[in-house]
Regions:
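Primarily recognizes the serine-hydrolase "nucleophile elbow" in alpha/beta-hydrolase
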Residues: 257, 263-325, 348
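Conserved strand-to-loop "acid loop" that flanks and positions the catalytic carboxylate
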Residues: 364-379, 426-428
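Cap/lid segment of the alpha/beta-hydrolase catalytic domain
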Residues: 145-264, 268-271, 314, 318-320
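C-terminal catalytic histidine-bearing segment of alpha/beta-hydrolase fold enzymes
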Residues: 332, 336, 389-450
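Mobile cap/lid helix-loop segments that gate and shape the active-site cleft of serine hydrolases
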Residues: 237, 304-359, 384-407
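Short beta-strand element of the alpha/beta-hydrolase
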Residues: 127-129, 138-148
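N-terminal pre-domain segments of enzymes
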Residues: 22-86, 443
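Bacterial N-terminal signal peptides
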Residues: 7-16
């Protein structure tokens, strides 16, 4: 098999670009399990990256038809070894319009939907919210994403109910319950994450979202009964898929469920006449950026993918074993990955037979922009960029504009963004910012020829 070799010397060159001068290794404690986290480029072991354009049996990808087969081979590897098998499509998809009104100072039509997955409307339900530019003359593209603590946090609109049920705790929640206090908080310019609805509408895009906690809960590794990770995490839409077979090592995971929900959101978009669902953008920040990337890798209907600040398990190379790594992932986030992934933790550089550049490649030839966050070394922006470089030949092979061949770009440097594939990073706080939204929409405009 043709491979791409990344040596310690290459890592040292990349280290010269990083803004973090300190060299250190820290220890995280996950319920008594001590896990080392490396933040020292010089400690990264040499590793080998598999070539996305070479089959497991050594055959070269020679045509677009070959690539379609190779893509399925790669997705099967990730299903069996990391993210778990892909959830099945639901037996039914009921999308009930709850209400509709003119909003956003008259510039949008806002609709709320309840989505059920059984014909009798029993079982799990996801609440989707949608804004459509009111004055558009033809169907518009749509940006879809999952939010963290409820649709009511996106805008100041009293008609949007506060998220009920379990919610990931935050400084403005009531423990694991969402709060009226968080209504519209993503309209606050000082928030780590914002939702610039007015800008999105003015750029000619619809926007849709749902709360990921309604898909399936996301308890922390240290949560106590009845919310402990090993059982409570597999509720919500997991109820659709029957009892888990714990003898399997490739069961459906939380990341797989959240990605599945994004595809169901696209199902809804396809039913809305004012939306051109063939021009869809999927995004998300942090763990929801991981979910967006997985959704686009699996579902070719997503035309543009812009995962934001994914951290380990998303865009960065796992074999670097830097920042958020396989060992932290399998102990802190046991429900995000299938049990087969555990075996790679002792030595990812030697044991892994795949890496995240291959997942990025599964989006090709569609448009992919990786947005990084440089303030925290946990996010490993160098690893993101190396993954992009290793995936770039696939876009070139398929005849699409690939990522420009430029040195590792500094924060806010747009030189690594191509027409169909690119990379950009920034500093400041962890969250999806105005910069991130602007870069996303500019990239989507180029992809759609706007």
């Amino acid at each position: 098999m043709k491979v791409i070799r990344v040596t310690a010397a290459v890592c040292a060159v990349l280290a010269a670009f990083t803004v973090h001068a300190a060299k250190l290794v820290v220890t995280n404690d996950y319920n008594g399990v001590k896990v080392l986290v490396n933040y020292d480029e010089s400690r990264i072991a040499p590793y080998t990256l598999e070539d996305p354009l070479t089959f497991v049996d050594g055959r070269k990808v020679k045509s677009q038809a070959d690539w379609r087969v190779r893509r399925e081979e790669i997705l099967e590897i990730f299903a069996k070894e990391m993210y778990g098998v892909e959830p099945p499509k639901p037996e039914a998809l009921i999308t009930d319009l709850v209400n509709e009104k003119v909003t956003a100072a008259g510039f949008a039509i806002r609709r709320q939907y309840k989505m059920y997955f059984k014909a009798d409307r029993t079982g799990p339900c996801i609440n989707w919210i949608l804004w459509i530019p009111r004055w558009a003359k033809k169907p518009v593209p749509v940006v879809s994403f999952l939010n963290y603590r409820g649709n009511h946090e996106l805008v100041c609109d009293d008609d949007i109910p506060v998220q009920t049920g379990w919610t990931r705790a935050g400084k403005h929640t009531d423990g694991n319950r969402s709060s009226e206090r968080t209504r519209g908080m993503m309209q606050d310019a000082n928030s780590d994450s914002i939702f610039p609805l007015a800008m999105i509408l003015a750029r000619g895009y619809a926007a849709m979202s749902a709360c990921y906690c309604e898909v399936s809960p996301d308890p922390g590794y240290n949560q106590k009964p009845p919310y402990e990770q090993k059982t409570f995490a597999y509720t919500g839409v997991f109820d659709l898929w029957g009892k888990r077979d714990e003898s399997r090592t490739d069961n459906i995971t939380a990341l797989g469920a959240w990605a599945w929900a994004l595809s169901r959101g696209l199902d809804l978009a396809e039913r809305v006449p004012e939306i051109d669902a063939k021009r869809s953008v999927v995004t998300g920040c942090s763990r929801l950026g991981k979910a967006a990337l997985l959704a686009a890798a699996r579902d070719e209907r997503f035309a543009v993918c812009v995962p934001n600040q994914t951290g380990g398990g998303g865009a960065p190379l796992a074999k670097r074993n830097y920042g958020e790594n396989v060992n932290t992932e399998i102990h802190a986030f046991t429900h995000w990955y299938c049990r087969a992934y555990d075996k790679y933790a002792p030595d990812p550089a030697k044991l892994l037979t795949f890496d995240q550049h291959m997942l990025l490649a599964c989006v090709a030839p569609r448009a992919l922009l990786i947005e990084g966050f440089d303030t925290s070394r946990w996010m490993d922006t160098e690893g993101e960029y190396l993954a992009c470089k290793a995936a770039a030949p696939v876009w070139k092979f398929l005849g699409k504009g690939t990522m420009p061949d430029v040195p590792y770009p500094d924060n806010y440097d747009l030189s690594a963004i191509g027409d169909s594939f690119g990379y950009v990073r920034r500093s400041e706080d962890h969250g999806i910012s105005g910069y991130d939204w602007q870069w996303m929409l500019d990239f989507a405009d180029r992809a759609f020829g706007k």
